[in-house]
Swiss-Prot record:
Membrane topology, record value: Peripheral membrane protein
Gene Ontology terms: cellular component: chloroplast membrane; plastoglobule
Induction per the UniProt record: Induced by salt stress and abscisic acid (ABA) in roots.
Stated role: Catalyzes the conversion of geranylgeranyl diphosphate to phytoene. Mediates the first committed step in carotenoid biosynthesis.
Highest rank taxon of the organism: Eukaryota
Gene: PSY1
Family: Belongs to the phytoene/squalene synthase family.
Tissue: Expressed in leaves. Highly expressed in developing leaves. Expressed at low levels in roots.
GO molecular function: 15-cis-phytoene synthase activity; geranylgeranyl diphosphate synthase activity; squalene synthase [NAD(P)H] activity
Name used for this protein in its record: Phytoene synthase 1, chloroplastic
Compartments in which it is found: Plastid, Chloroplast membrane; Plastid, Chloroplast, Plastoglobule
GO biological process: one example: carotenoid biosynthetic process
């Protein structure tokens, strides 16, 4: 699930030398070769363009459910109604959920397509997955520990997804980022297309290619993540939260959509597939918003401001205030509003975590609890995210692990709700 968005954190160190060379090789080596009307009405009543709502009121006799669509429409300065980013992303969610539901239906036995074009040595796939696990352990220790409770197939698949996402992220955030161009990302996307058709370029690609032959994973979230990297190359400001939401989906929400088919839904869950995907998306958005709020000063030093420009203006703040990095009452008030929004996304995500397969819940809960604590640390720093970097200490991380494990044993929320 979106807990794997730990890989998107700007705080993570660079890749090992070997993996960094892989990122640089992209440029050199690769160059060689809408819902029904009734629901719309309720959505307009409950939701705003500024803050996420926690769900849609259930109709009589229905189980309460969450929805990621906080406003299905937004209005331009000219007064024209356009589809919001939330609605666009929700359309992707529906597609992913439909794919998983088709996969869960009884199917005639077929032999999966295994990557053939890569000349792997004997036990090559085993070695490829092992290397993916090593990378995950090195850069996301807490999450890696949680994956050890999963079945072997699921564990290895999550490692493979993690590594692809990390390599993609390193293209624009890693040591070779200054050499990456839009055409390099185009070549990376071509390489993605190849591995989805069983033609991986290297050992790490082969692990992901094998994974997608075993699970109903769609290529769209992967393409969308690459689009997020393109956005980082050309865009340094976001006019409003609608724009920022789309960016957060591209670089973090996508990971949740990639991961749900692997992590699986608990057989006893009464939640809809769509609601589980929606919660995975919400966790990705929450984690990325947390990254943004933690890294305001660091991003400003790179000339980037990942904050809604219209909300900054409403708070009486400007880009100059961000670059000056002085904590004022205006800044504190603005940050309280941003933190509130991020917490609302975390709250929406919580219900969905309980619906996952029990063996998959621990790493997701661990990520959720640890990332949410970063918001507490920002508050503890008196909202100084210009010169102080909020982080969760080792002691708090260790304390969070048993709490996360305990929550992973809880009955799915949908089952508890249906018994009331």
């Amino acid at each position: 699930m979106a807990a794997i968005t730990l890989l998107r954190s700007a705080s993570l160190p660079g890749l090992s030398d070997a993996l960094a060379r892989d990122a640089a090789a992209v440029q050199h080596v690769c160059s060689s070769y809408l819902p029904n009307n009734k629901e719309k009405k309720r959505r307009w009543i409950l939701c705003s363009l500024k803050y996420a709502c926690l769900g849609v009121d259930p109709a009589p006799g229905e189980i309460a459910r969450t929805s990621p669509v906080y406003s299905s429409l937004t209005v331009t300065p000219a007064g024209e109604a356009v589809i919001s980013s939330e609605q666009k992303v929700y359309d992707v969610v529906l597609k992913q959920a439909a794919l998983l539901k088709r996969h869960l239906r009884p199917q005639p036995h077929t032999i999966p397509i295994v990557p053939k074009d890569l000349d792997l040595p004997r036990n090559g796939l085993k070695q490829a997955y092992h290397r993916c696990g090593e990378i995950c352990e090195e850069y996301a220790k807490t999450f890696y520990l949680g994956t050890m409770l999963m079945t072997e197939d699921r564990r290895r698949a999550i490692w493979a997804i993690y590594v692809w996402c990390r390599r993609t992220d390193e293209l624009v955030d890693g040591p070779n980022a200054s050499h990456i161009t839009p055409s390099a990302l185009d070549r990376w996307e071509k390489r993605l297309d190849d591995l989805f058709t069983g033609r991986p370029y290297d050992m790490l690609d082969a692990a992901l290619s094998d994974t997608i032959s075993k699970f109903p994973i769609d290529i769209q979230p992967f393409r969308d993540m690459i689009e997020g990297m393109r956005s980082d190359l050309r865009k340094t400001r976001y006019k409003n939260f609608d724009e920022l939401y789309m960016y957060c989906y591209y670089v973090a929400g996508t990971v949740g959509l990639m991961s749900v088919p692997v992590m699986g839904i608990a057989p006893e869950s009464k939640a809809t597939t769509e609601s589980v995907y929606s919660a995975a998306l919400a966790l990705g958005i929450a984690n990325q918003l947390t990254n943004i709020l933690r890294d305001v000063g660091e991003d400003a030093r790179r000339g980037r401001i990942y904050l809604p420009q219209d909300e900054l203006a409403e708070a009486g703040l400007s880009d100059e205030d961000i670059f000056n990095g002085v904590v004022t009452n205006k800044w504190r008030s603005f940050m309280k509003r941003q933190i509130k929004r991020a917490r609302m996304f975390f709250e929406e995500a919580e219900r969905g975590v309980t619906e996952l397969s029990q063996a998959s819940r621990w790493p997701v809960w661990a990520s959720l609890l640890l990332y949410r604590q970063i918001l507490d640390e920002i508050e503890a720093n008196d909202y100084n995210n210009f010169t102080k970097r909020a982080y969760v200490g080792k002691a708090k991380k260790l304390l969070a692990l048993p709490v996360a494990y305990g929550r992973s044993l809880l009955m799915p929320y949908s089952l508890r709700n249906s018994q009331k």
